[in-house]
Amino acid sequence: MGSSKSKPKDPSQRRHSLEPPDSTHHGGFPASQTPDETAAPDAHRNPSRSFGTVATEPKLFWGFNTSDTVTSPQRAGALAGGVTTFVALYDYESWTETDLSFKKGERLQIVNNTEGDWWLAHSLTTGQTGYIPSNYVAPSDSIQAEEWYFGKITRRESERLLLNPENPRGTFLVRKSETAKGAYCLSVSDFDNAKGPNVKHYKIYKLYSGGFYITSRTQFGSLQQLVAYYSKHADGLCHRLANVCPTSKPQTQGLAKDAWEIPRESLRLEAKLGQGCFGEVWMGTWNDTTRVAIKTLKPGTMSPEAFLQEAQVMKKLRHEKLVQLYAVVSEEPIYIVIEYMSKGSLLDFLKGEMGKYLRLPQLVDMAAQIASGMAYVERMNYVHRDLRAANILVGENLVCKVADFGLARLIEDNEYTARQGAKFPIKWTAPEAALYGRFTIKSDVWSFGILLTELTTKGRVPYPGMVNREVLDQVERGYRMPCPPECPESLHDLMCQCWRKDPEERPTFKYLQAQLLPACVLEVAE
């Protein structure tokens, strides 16, 4: 796919120094206690001074989230328990006449939340009514409305956000624990001369009585009180909580309510970003308001009817590591409108100026993001069919998202469908798919192994010096690419697992995601 960028209006970032109120209850760690010792205080015994009973058994665990996370960061906005008053988490400027503009902090009365991702709301500030993106609001006076609460994001995603070079030491967020139901985790950026920038994670335990604590000697009636206390006192943490982790506005789910099949006239193509065998990719604007990427397909590339049917499935695939499909123009020439990311394709990024500065930990993290997106595709019983660096898009802070999932199946070009010639990506395709057309999630796993070589070689074409026919013959005879220069043997071993001859013996994307361990994080708790 081509490159993509953010909207013309820069997303506002949320960075605030905390001026917390006095805590109502505190105790304190022993002065001699080190950060590592605070990882899981009293992890194997009941609290000695307790205001209630511990709801979950504290325990250590290092692991990764494999749940169906769909946005990053995710903030719940669903109506529950009759709650109808919500607070705006971000500014929103309307894109259509039926949208409602609002400012961060504005209180909104939800009129109707039964129509999917766009809710009908009434502003208690302006008195106006219109549709709002549901992921831009949270129930009033709830933890979801707190700027430091990031909800169900993964440990790895919290590290990526906190390790932004612009974040000072003590930047923090609170998220749901991945390993203990009902518990939370406090993630804090730190720095030391030996390790450089790193992130420490402190599990927040919950009492049956409703209180919270990191160490049983210091308990609080609410998470807000806990954050307020530790923003004034490090008290055993690596650093006091100095700044809330900044984050950009999330993508809305679609361009607007009912904006799916859109008129061609609503799109303005502004700059060509790339060109392939079957079309072009443009930077553009929808409705004169919204920055988007537009993929234009040459007439005859695929059946408009088949494309529209497939697109209905594709738009339901929503994950933080999948490029979001916004809208389509279904008459030829077909236009595909997607979210617009800032750094273009991963292949161009690796081969460009920025690629020179990427080190192994960053490359492995990018691979883990791709595996996360593909693990979701795997859970949804979908198949990509064309997984390679050219079809991964890169955004700010090295965020990677999978694009073009499912489109390869619809291409009607004779040379492509015959799986031969320059148009077909033989070097990325599993032998059973290239020879017999057996495309499955396991053939995607093979392609992921090839993509790992693209990452570790900064965009080198796989099987250097070999033509397509030779690649097929050699792979059938058992040849596998050797370990790339400066690539760890453990990573090459993972590649070879992806290239096992029997598709059923290849690992799952869930397994691959877990194996791509972070390389720059200090384990403290969770």
UniProtKB/Swiss-Prot annotation:
Say which enzyme class the record assigns.
Answer: transferase
Reactions catalysed, as given in the entry:
L-tyrosyl-[protein] + ATP = O-phospho-L-tyrosyl-[protein] + ADP + H(+)
Q: Indicate the secretion signal residues.
A: none
Post-translational modification summary for this protein:
The phosphorylated form is termed pp60v-src.
Keywords, comma-separated and alphabetical: ATP-binding, Kinase, Lipoprotein, Myristate, Nucleotide-binding, Oncogene, Phosphoprotein, Repeat, SH2 domain, SH3 domain, Transferase, Tyrosine-protein kinase
Which residue positions are annotated as catalytic? Answer: D386
Chain positions found as Phosphotyrosine = Y416
Listed Basic and acidic residues bias regions: 7-25
Q: Which residues bind ATP?
A: L273, G274, Q275, G276, C277, F278, G279, E280, V281, K295
Where in the numbering of this chain does the SH3 domain appear? Answer: 71-139, 81-142
Q: Where is the SH2 domain?
A: 148-245
Residue ranges, annotated region (Disordered): 1-52
According to the record's subunit comment, the protein's assembly and interactions are: Homodimer.
Q: Quote the function comment for this protein.
A: This phosphoprotein, required for both the initiation and the maintenance of neoplastic transformation, is a protein kinase that catalyzes the phosphorylation of tyrosine residues in vitro.
Annotated protein name in UniProt: Tyrosine-protein kinase transforming protein Src
Q: What gene is this protein a product of?
A: V-SRC
